[in-house]
Amino acid sequence: ELWRHVGPDMDVPAGDIGVGGREVGYMFGMYKKLTHEFTGTFTGKGLEFGGSLIRPEATGFGGLYFVKHMLDKKGIDIKGKTVAISGFGNVAWGAATKATQLGAKVVTISGPDGYIYDPDGISGEKIDYMLELRASGNDIVAPYADKFPGSTFVEGRRPWEVKVDIALPCATQNELNGEDAMNLINNSVLCVGEISNMGCTPEAIDAFIEHKLMYAPGKAVNAGGVATSGLEMSQNAMHLSWTAQEVDEKLHQIMHNIHEQCVKYGTEPDGYINYVKGANIAGFMKVAHAMMAQGIVLSLIHISEPTRLGMIS
């Protein structure tokens, strides 16, 4: 029954927690049998049948591009900065890979069992080992400390107690709470980028904004995954296969554009960039303009007070 409700111009399923290339492949295969069509209806497919390079790591890559733009806006170089990452799946792996490429030092990853602190930096074969940990199916990170001397496994705790310059939730929802936020603030964190979906609790977000911290929500920071799904669909529609460099460059430009929109709508009179406000207003304005351009009449719709937008008539 599902196949009637999905399509390249209708609804496009993709991977997430618990849904990877294998599951997407099974669904795409059945969809083809039912429709007798090869279209970009599913994304995150295998490279052998219409998938895109960079797609598995795209969410992490895009998140780092966004964070770099946040720092650049304040004249801060990401090179040499320490980074705390949670999780050890595709998103965390992509984030660690791109952070290292940009010259930052990743010092933590985490799992349900606790977190790893590696002051020497998680790069090279250590990043590759993250994939081995995930493939093992054990859902633990403790073996990392056994394999790489000098690193420490901290059982049952989250990585936000480590003093770092940049914090990147990459695991799951509500993984960074108000107490964690205050730990980061007290440790003088520069920037928090929410790469996981709803990774920060409302209390944490309020604390970041109250302290005028550079914080950006997942709806902006983790858009790289959805953006690259769109790039995969474009390749399918044109029957092309772009190189990894081509996809990466397009992804970088998309994240740059998203950041610019957040800055446009989120900059406050005192110069603080409220990325939550900016992302919300930018998203709303895009949808509202499209609706009005297509003939939808919006009459005296009052926007919620926190957006300070007034009304559209």
Regions found by a protein language model. Name each.
Residues 10-15, 37-42, 85, 108-111, ...:
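General beta-strand structural signal in soluble alpha/beta enzymes
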Residues 185-299:
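Adenosine-phosphate binding glycine-rich loop
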Residues 14-24, 44-46, 80-90, 113, ...:
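A glycine-rich phosphate-binding loop feature that marks nucleotide/adenosyl-phosphate handling sites
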Residues 1-53, 286-298:
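N-terminal ligand-binding/catalytic initiation module
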Residues 6-15, 38-40, 74-82, 262-278, ...:
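Flexible, glycine/charged-enriched surface loops at secondary-structure junctions
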Residues 114-215, 220:
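Rossmann-like adenosine-cofactor binding region
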Residues 301-313:
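Single conserved hydrophobic/aromatic residue that forms the stacking wall/gate
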Residues 54-57, 61-158:
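Glycine-rich phosphate/diphosphate-binding loop of Rossmann-like nucleotide-binding domains
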